[in-house]
Amino acid sequence: MTPLILALLVTMQSTDIEREAAGGVLRQIDSLEVRIRPTELAERLAGRSDPARDRVLARVAAVWSGEMQSLSDWIGHHPEVGWHEFQAVDTLTAVLRAYGFQVDTGVAGMPTAFVARWTSPAGANGPTLGLIAEYDALRGTQGDFHGDQHNAQSPIVLAAARALTEYMAQARVAGRVVVYGTPAEEVDPPAKALLWKAGVFRGADILVRSHSSTETRRDRPGFGVCCLDIDAVKYTFTGRPAHQLTAWNGRNALEAAVQFYSAVDHLRSTWRPDARVQGVIPEGGIAPNVVPDHTVVDYFIRFPDEVYLEHIARMMDDAAKGAAEMTGTEVSVTRYGEYRDGVTVASLEELFFAYAKKLGAPGLADEKGRPAGYEETGPVSRDVPGVGITVRSSSFANHTYGMRDDTFAEIGHHAFLIDAQIEAAVLFDFLTHPELRTAVAQEHHTLAGLQGQYLNALRRVYGPEIGADTALSKESRADLTIPKVQRP
């Protein structure tokens, strides 16, 4: 069995039942590596002598040190949480317009989303290179902060985009460069899924994005997402208020919430051990002398595959309805976030890693990570091949103040420069080497098609365990509503 198949065998995802379901899929992928040989292709492209590419990388370094490093620091010192990133968007789009991009803001009804397009003077009859930019901050006990280094991701993209457009214009290479400004990576609903549903990514031939990390690591090919498949669900119980001394005149929504929360705990023993179900009661009533008539229970439901995840979600819906029935209250269910597996393409992962080694990226990890579908962009990566580039930019874990501080230090600045150069190198090769475009398209098309077969196989294998839920709907049940935000 080839290395690619062995890699897929241990990572599609991690449970015995998934490996059983994946068996037939793995056999079909076996011939894919023989045709493409992604590691060999990547090493050949990265190792070749190419003065034009090297000039592009030198230009990335000049743009980063001259403009983008200070922009990264500025965004870092002015953190804005998801859906509120107005200063960052104003600044980034002004720079892109100065670089010759045509910029649309408020895309797909999101005030802080934008798309910036540049077309080569040689024409648009070439590849469309997409770069995903993020800029939202985290909420923290000490105030909003860039503990995931999103402040650097957009300047990284802009440095790569600037160097590529200059090369394409000077060398008369046809094609387009598109920068997608995507807000709110850290909060629900998932903005990239909403942008995908609105058709914003339509027309892109490749997408690249970067993300901070404590190591430089490529992912294994296959199907997956960084943090398991997730349903973010709110259960709202509505009752009737009354004085607590005559509580029988009311309908206690808090009692319903507690009964539901307790029922979920009892259900855990009936679920596979890979399930991760975490919840809070953010709204539990106002005063102890009033029967609560409104409560909210907020859950993240996680599982390695979406088939069993939906089974868990349906059981929880039934438990919520039961709690409402017991207490004489009503319950409404809102799925405000949905994260699903994407497709990870070895041709791009290996190319990114080959350039990481060539450029001296710190913290190289030989062991590959699990398939991530360039993180929370799962549905996007099923349609458009892409790669998430991670270069070690901190010695502290993600979502920490230590990682925020490293954003402004040499460890961060150096990593961000290498990240920008890798993005530019991967896109340069995709632009100038039809062999790479063919390999990426073939691999992505095959994996995207096999993902459907894999999910159907999971339904068959799970059948006796989840019963009628084997015939799950392919349509999203999520209510992904854009929050209403006013510009300050």
What are these model-derived regions, one by one?
Residues V60, W64, M68, S72, ...:
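Sec/Tat-exported extracytoplasmic proteins
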Residues D16-G147, N151-R176:
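Acidic/His- and Gly-rich active-site-bordering loop/insert found
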Residues T105-G106, A184-E185, F223-C227, K368-P371, ...:
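Short Gly/Pro-enriched turn/cap motifs at secondary-structure boundaries
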Residues M1-A7:
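Sec-dependent signal peptide recognition
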